Amino acid sequence: MYHFLNLDNKTRSIMISELEQDIKNSLFYEPSSIKPEYISSYKLLLRKYFEVGHIESLEKALTPLCFKAEDKNGRKIPSNIAQTIAFSDFNRYYARAILVRAIDEGKSVSIYRAKQSLKERTESKTLVLLCNL
């Protein structure tokens, strides 16, 4: 389970605005593991779950039909691809929204782990500490 601080209506609104801006300006990153015919649906899912959902709900909405069987090099797409993509995109737009909001409100931000781990890597722990000095 992920814990996103300040994931309220204001932050969600900024996430949606950032997504729409990327789409409008052709800057939206299209995950290469998603079949081209599902990209439009994926953008709609992102908007929907940015508005009312969480990573876990987005992940559940990404059915195996959305994904290619193999990457461009012929390697099998990992079984956890929905989880990976859901986290990557939700986290990316959440982080952007938090930064936009902090700038608008004249506040600072702190780095933290959104998902607690039983076996937290030392490198990860060190990076979080260094970023908050």
Where on the chain are the PLM-derived regions?
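Domain-core detector
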Residues: 1-133
